[in-house]
């Protein structure tokens, strides 16, 4: 067969399987590839290939993640599956595997379990926009009333954590039957993929979002003015456009008078480009690493926020001891460290290495931020945690 595999003409979406241990996430992932392989939309991948997920490092944290790709009639998908619960927690908090949507796998025989709850909560906290449910192992349940009961429980749980529990598609099936090639098993997988296609919204492309570029370096070029360099995170910047410099100090307005890439002058820079941007009338000492250039009014500086954080274990090179209220580490946002103070919730005395927790942070200087922004927590230059901003408080 010719290697005319994935044409990139279809819109791309990142998804992942989440849910309690042993409810069938990896079997489902394998089943999707095997069923879609029949129509040429995937390379059939066996359970043990996915289960032996390689370790990856993301911001100093070791995470095991399996990646598979496949396509339906309408879309191309990159799908992540993690072998262990801790891998999910780390993955979702660090954003190592960006999820535009999730497939929540629940065993019909067991119903929602502790990690089912935790993954739904995490998905809400880190801003996974939508999810579809696969009620797995229905071949192990003889009683239709029990299936109905489990479905109701799942819907209530989703609503409790702020997802539209009444609207979310719940597909009932058996990943095992699909792996065995049974027609009813395959039918459920096809139904699931139709639901994923129609219910999980197409993500907004980075170039369609407002312009934002974290500043990495600042130079002054004699006779031309100040140039800041960095990688454009989102949007497009055109020569002549007004921009704001946000974070660390009061927000300033300036104008982009030139965009340079690989020493060539361009009319514009866009998401993903490493560029130098020439700023009109801005002095070298008025800009610094850690600020961002942004479309006016699109992002504001803040110093108080709530976060969901994973604290590295001792084995991962993290702290050996727990931390308590008023702990003051550095928070590394985009390109710079800012000191901040942690306030734990009233019912939590301490946070242990290897745990994840929700707490409030107050920084000594404001940073350009929006919900969903990722950061690292550092102590003396080493990473001790990773987090995501879940709510801005001022």
UniProtKB/Swiss-Prot annotation:
| Matches recorded under Gene3D superfamilies | P-loop containing nucleotide triphosphate hydrolases, Translation factors
Q: Does the keyword Protein biosynthesis apply?
A: yes
G3: annotated span: 81-84
Q: Which residues form the tr-type G domain?
A: 10-204
Which residue ranges are recorded for the region named G5? 174-176
Matching InterPro entries, A to Z?
A: EF-Tu_GTP-bd (IPR041709), EF-Tu_GTPase (IPR050055), EFTu-like_2 (IPR004161), EFTU_2 (IPR033720), G_TR_CS (IPR031157), P-loop_NTPase (IPR027417), Small_GTP-bd (IPR005225), T_Tr_GTP-bd_dom (IPR000795)
Localization terms from the record = Cytoplasm
Q: Extract one GO cellular component term from the record.
A: cytoplasm
Q: What is the lineage of its organism?
A: Bacteria, Pseudomonadati, Pseudomonadota, Alphaproteobacteria, Rickettsiales
Any idea what this protein is called?
A: Elongation factor Tu
Q: Which SUPFAM superfamilies match?
A: EF-Tu/eEF-1alpha/eIF2-gamma C-terminal domain, P-loop containing nucleoside triphosphate hydrolases, Translation proteins
The family classification in the record reads: Belongs to the TRAFAC class translation factor GTPase superfamily. Classic translation factor GTPase family. EF-Tu/EF-1A subfamily.
Q: Does the keyword Zinc apply?
A: no
Per UniProt, subunit arrangement is: Monomer.
Q: Where does Mg(2+) bind?
A: 26
Region (G2) residue ranges read 60-64
Q: Which reaction does it catalyse?
A: GTP + H2O = GDP + phosphate + H(+)
Q: What is its EC number?
A: 3.6.5.3
Which Pfam families does the annotation name?
Answer: GTP_EFTU, GTP_EFTU_D2, GTP_EFTU_D3
Alphabetical UniProt keywords: Cytoplasm, Elongation factor, GTP-binding, Hydrolase, Magnesium, Metal-binding, Nucleotide-binding, Protein biosynthesis
Function, as annotated, reads:
GTP hydrolase that promotes the GTP-dependent binding of aminoacyl-tRNA to the A-site of ribosomes during protein biosynthesis.
* Annotated region described as G4, given as residue ranges: 136-139
Annotated positions binding GTP: 19-26, 81-85, 136-139
| Main localisation | cytoplasm
Membrane-spanning residues = none
Q: Output one GO MF annotation.
A: GTP binding
Where are the annotated segments for G1? Answer: 19-26
